[in-house]
Amino acid sequence: KTINETLESDDINQQLFAVELIKDLEMDQWRQTLNKLLLTDNPILQKQILLLAFNRKSIIDKKVLIQLSNQKNEIGALGITFLADDNIREEKKRLYNNINSSDTHISAASSVAILRIEPENKLARKRLDEFLDVKDEDSTAIALDYLKNSSELLTRDLLNNLLHHPSTKISKSALNVSGERLD
């Protein structure tokens, strides 16, 4: 009860503290509150909850995920990464239109999502390859972050090159991706 009250507090610092407290606990008892908080207009809190739920995606309601994934910002991109394959198929047209978004997070997350259900999709592959071509360190690092759970979309050779890239930002992001691979 106390944690739930803290999560529902009007103080962002208390809410973030409560999110930190529950990170290693079973979260089902706070599911309703966490979903409600995801619909607030606080991107810091939304991001922390999404990162907390990354390996426990079942605590986030499908309707909330769809709503979040419609945002044109980093929160929307994180929401896209949570979508199950059947949701990606349902949202395919919108995600396909997002591939050329000016928001790097939305474009990268949408490209990866489309490639999860259509590995041969040329437009999504072209866009992802553009990100991985390291013309812009930030864009490449962002794209790598969205490949964490889809590392099969990245060849071993390219991952190895990115691990040894002179940019710390890129090599760190590549290391995060490689930690998810089994090959």
Regions found by a protein language model. Give the residues of each.
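Membrane-proximal soluble helical/coiled-coil segments
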Residues: N4-D61, E74
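Short inter-helical turns and helix N-cap capping residues of alpha-solenoid HEAT/ARM repeat scaffolds
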Residues: D10-D11, D41-P43, Q71-N73, S102-T104, ...
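Solenoidal tandem-repeat scaffolds enriched in leucines and small polar residues
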Residues: S107, V112-R156, K169
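Amphipathic alpha-helical scaffolding segments comprising HEAT/armadillo-like alpha-solenoid repeats
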Residues: T2-T6, M27-L39, S58-S69, I88-N100, ...
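Short, intrinsically disordered, charge-balanced linker/junction segments flanking boundaries
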Residues: S167, A174-D183
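Residue-level signature of the C-terminal ends
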Residues: I22-L25, L52-I59, L83-D86, I114-E118, ...
